[in-house]
């Protein structure tokens, strides 16, 4: 299938960095260095808007991309540029630079904010969050302050059935922001000794 808008967009935006595209939202997300800042869907290039640029996009007559999720419309932060913009590719590039900057800043904010709930940490699920809550640990900050060993001990004390060593590795990985399987054997032995 020929996708001229996608090809033209990738060609135009490639000067911004290492460009890739992935299928998403019924179209293709456009990424520079793993940061999505544009979307090609319904044969239109959409650029990511920020709180500052959203009004500018609306003034220019750009429409947000809307898709349905469970039957309800979801309005995205991606606005379709008008076909006339293709007559001035430099103006698209200028807006794309702003869109990329916005996307990078949003990505950094998300990274630094971190998960707000325990279940959103690596390795942990809702069941683990409930076990920790029963043990008196209700927030991500409390878990980090308690530490994996003490959190594991608290779960052992409040749980009638036995809990596996894997839970200890999962807690340690969650606190460190990594998958439990990459925790070294040395660290696992140190943690086991503290039990």
Curated annotation (Swiss-Prot):
Similarity-based family: Belongs to the Sxy/TfoX family.
Function description: Required for efficient DNA transformation jointly with TfoX1.
Lineage: Bacteria, Pseudomonadati, Pseudomonadota, Gammaproteobacteria, Vibrionales
Keywords: Competence
Gene encoding the protein: tfoY
GO biological process: DNA import into cell involved in transformation; establishment of competence for transformation
Record flagged with keyword Ligase: no
Presence of the UniProt keyword Repeat in the record: no
Domain of life: Bacteria
Disruption phenotype: Defective in DNA transformation.
Protein name: DNA transformation protein TfoY
InterPro entries, per database record: TfoX-like (IPR047525), TfoX-like_gammaprotbact (IPR026256), TfoX_C (IPR007077), TfoX_N (IPR007076)
Signal peptide: none
Protein's organism: Aliivibrio fischeri (strain ATCC 700601 / ES114) (Vibrio fischeri)
Pfam families associated with the record: TfoX_C, TfoX_N
